[in-house]
Each structure stands twice: as structure tokens, then as C-alpha cells.
Swiss-Prot record:
Task of the protein: glp-1/Notch and lin-12/Notch proteins promote signaling by recruiting lag-3 to target promoters, where it functions as a transcriptional activator, probably as part of a complex with a Notch intracellular domain (NICD) and the transcription regulator lag-1. Involved in the p53-mediated germ-cell apoptotic response to DNA damage, perhaps acting as a transcriptional activator. May regulate phosphatase lip-1 mRNA transcription downstream of glp-1.
Species name: Caenorhabditis elegans
One Pfam family per UniProt: Activator_LAG-3
Protein's name according to its UniProt entry: Protein lag-3
Gene Ontology biological-process entries: Notch signaling pathway; positive regulation of DNA-templated transcription; positive regulation of stem cell proliferation; positive regulation of transcription by RNA polymerase II; regulation of mesodermal cell fate specification
Amino acid sequence: MDDLSEFFVIEEMFISEPSVAGMKPSTSKTTHSPPPEEPTAPFVNDNLPNPEDEPTIGDLNAFHSGEELHRQRSELARANYEKARPEMIANQRAVTAHLFNRYTEDEERKRVEQQKNKEAMNASTSAPTSSRNGGQSVENRKRRNDVVVAPPTSEEEWKRAQQQHWMGQQQPQMQFQMQQQYHSQQQQYIMMQQQHHHMTGMQQIHHQMPSTSSADSIRSVPTPASSMHQPSPAEMRNGCGMSRNATMDMTCSPMSGGQPIVDENNLAVPEGEWFDKLALAVAEQYNVDTILGPDTYDTFLAELDFSSSESPTKQSPMEMNGDRMPSTAPPPAQNPQHIAQLQQQQNKMRLMQQQQQEMQRIEQQRRQQIMQQQQQQQQQEHQRQQMLLQQQQQQQQMQQHHQMNGGGQFATQAHQQAAYMQQMQRMEQIRHQQQQAQQHQQAQQQHQQQAQHHQMGYGIPNGYPQQMHMHPPAYGAHHMPQPTAFANIN
């Protein structure tokens, strides 16, 4: 029985032995996997991807769904484009036809004017030639060459004014020359007209263009403002120059094909009613969720609410007075003065709000700055106290050391040690500076030498690594044979 118990005890000891602290099985990874070695040859590719990191087929589903969505969207866009395209083409065709018609009209008008000029010239020359004067015929010939330069038509004057305005906008330095040129041309025309009248014996010819009188030439250079909305004479003739603002959508040009053609001539500044309609349209389409949000549009919304709540209050006292106002009658239109006053009030309110916000912002900034300054002062104070504490502790330690080492000589020894350390630091700094200067000089020398080598052709790369040629060779001043690219001739 004792033997058995002894056997069990021994067994127990053997079993529990590995759980002793020294024999615990190691969990560290380094004992199992040795550190990865550097590859011996440079062309061994160690960076192969881990096949377990590859994406699975299921990961592609999201990608494919995205592609499909994109394809559907592009198909939709294509269909929309196909729908809209014929209309776009038709619009372009209308514009092109309009331009072409204008061009042909211009050509026709030019031709007619040339014809008129010829007729006028013939009429003016036919009268005096009956008196067969030699000198007069010379005069006639001279003047005939002059009159070919026709006086400017109203159309040309309008075009010149517009062109002058545009040129002045583009290059300001050109404007003065243009004006000078225009003045001189006007003077020429006046001279020609006077000469013409004189020659024809003051008889007025029916065909000739309206003369440029001195009264006209006073306002010869139109200002940009006047020429901006000035309708062209062609449109004045067609009778659409004046009635612009009433019928914006009905334009007079016959080639517009029922489509409104708006250019710089029939473009009118919109009146107040137009603005009201626009405000209504904006308010109808306004949606809090989609557009910027309530905070930006708060003022506009408040104004809208204010104006809408005001109209019933205006109506109510009239209704309470008596039944003479039927309930179905439209609310009375506010007079423009009242509207202007309202707008002024709103503008004042808005300005005051902005000023208040600005004041609050400045106040906040000032508070923040004061807080920051206080924090900085506290931090500095804290640092100062800590420094004082450290100094006190060091002094205490010194005193303790002094007491332990038994007085006398330690104070002088500490002083000596400090002086020695300072001296060492100074020496180190000087050595460092010298070293830097030397390195700089060497680098400069090396640079010059490299440039020389390149000139002489030594700098051409051969397969060998670059040598540092300029370092002073080792072992005293003896020239040790260095391995060079060429045969060593020393």
C-alpha cells in the first residue's frame, strides 16, 4: 500500500513538473520563426502577394452594380439628348437664318445706296455741263471724285457710335484716336457738303441723303450711355424701336419665325411689376429641404410672411365699417410710396441686425483674447514656481552632499568640475566649427575638380563606382595606389 502511494506521489510530481515557472512552454514568436533574412541576390522577388488576401468573387458584386447603374444613367442621358436635339438644331437654324437675312438685307441696302449716290452725282453734274466751261468741267471732275465718298447715313452713324462704344470698352487707349478720326471725318463731310451746295447753286437735289448740318455735328460723339439702348435705324423703320417694354415677346423682325429674338436693341430694363412676378415665382419654387436651408433664407421668409400678414389687416377695417365693400373684392393695391417705405424699414432692420451681430462677434473675440492672456499668465506663473522648487531641491541636495562628504573641499571641487565642463564644451565647439569649415573647403575643391574632369573627358561614366579622388591619401603623405578605372601608372 505504501509502495502504491509512493508511486502515485512520484507520478504526480512528474506530471506537475512542466508547470513550474522555469519550464513553461514559450509563447514568443521569435523562438518559432527565425527573423526573415535579407535576400542574397537583388533579383529575388520577395514581395509576392499573399494569396489569402485576394478579393473573392462576392466582393465584385458592389462593383458590378455600380457599373450597371452608371450604364443606365448614361443611357437615360443619351435618350434625353436625342429628344432635345432636334429642338436645339431648329433653334440654331432659326438664328442662322436670322443672321443670313440680316446680312442679305445689309447687302441690298448698300447696293441701293450706291445706286442713289450714282444718281445724285449724275444729277449734280448734268446741270452745269451745259455751259461748256473748261475750268468748270475741271472743277466738276475734281468734285465728282470727292462726292464718291458718300456722306454718312443714319445707319452708318449708329453703327459707328456702337462700334466706338465697344472699342472703348475693349481698349481704352484706342478711344481717343477713334474720336479724333470721327471728328475729322465729320469736318470733311461738312466741307464737302458746303462745296457741293456752292457748286450746284444752292439747288436741293431730291435724291441726296440728309445733310450733316452743324447742329447735328455738335453732338457728334455720342456717349456710351446714349448709344447703349439706341435702336438701330433699320428697326426704327420697321417700327419696333419704341414699343419695346410693352411687347417684349412680340418682336417685329419678319425673319424671326415666331420666336422672340432678343438682342441689345430690344432688351428693356424690367419694371417693378416684373420684379413682383419674379419674387412670386421664387417664393413658389422655394423649398426648405433642398435649398440652402432655413438659416440663410430666414430674412427673406420673414419678409414674405410680413407682407402676406399685412394685406388682410389692411382689408379688415374696411369690412368692419360696412357692407359697401363686398367680400369678393380684390385687396386694394398698395401705393408705391408705401412699398418704398416698407422696403426702407426692412433695410434698416436688416442693417441693425447685422450691426448687432458684428458687435456680438467682436465682443466674443475680445473675451476669448482676455481668457487666452489669463491662461498664458497662469502657465508662466506655474513654470516660474516649478523652476524655483527645482532650484530649492538642488540646493538642499548640495547641502546634504556637503554634510555627507564632511565639508571643506567639496564646494571648491564642484566649482572646479563646472569650470572644467565649460572649458570642454568650448573646445568642442571650436573643433566643430573648424571641421565644418574644412568640409566646406573640401566640397568646393571637389566641385572644381569635377568640373575640370568633365572638361577633360574623365567624367564619362564607365561601369566602375565613382572614386573620391580628392581626399588626402592615407598613411602619411605617401601616395597609396588606389584602384582606378584605368591602368595605375604611379
